[in-house]
Amino acid sequence: MRLVSLLAAFGSILFVASPHSSAAAAPDADAQVRTLKLNELAIKTVENHFLPDGKRKSLSQLTGEMKKGKVAGAPRGLFVTLSKAGKTRACWGSITPEHDDLITATVYTTEAALNKEYRFAQVKRGEVKDLKAQVTVIKAVTPIDSIRAINPLRHGLFVRQGGRAAVLLPGECVDAHYQLVQCKLKAGIPVNSRCQMYRITADVYHK
């Protein structure tokens, strides 16, 4: 099962959008995001990361080139997952926007996955050709009172209790109760205790 890193500051105000907000219901914007092919941009970022000195571009240069002729997308929370043969090699991201647009977020989050991921062995140069990238773009984070409000195949889950918190992305579980238990365990929250729950609505981009 894939685990993800949560970079949202626990003490800050969460980005919470209702199902009727512009972030949750913008089909034209969603169509524009699909044209960005964010998963391909993530792979290009990985390839750039492993180029030798003198050929490797700075992240700002790489981002600038990727933005040419494109609408870069409104800022949203975003996760990048790198996998090999169906197994996660790195995953990083935040449920809240950390960059000005989606292209910038994809590039910098991919680089963070390569440099900051601590649960898996670091990705090596020889693995690049076998890597696949998935980019999960957060559309809404909505408070819920019951797991009945979640379809784990379509929704992610964010749980929080005091300073403990964790995220599971959409599609990581097939059963809502199991999703809640796993998310609590990941956060270090006692399974039988109450906690704040948030449904994550997101679009997932991969090949």
Language model segments and positions:
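Signal peptide processing junction and immediate N-terminal pro/mature segment
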Residues: A17-A26
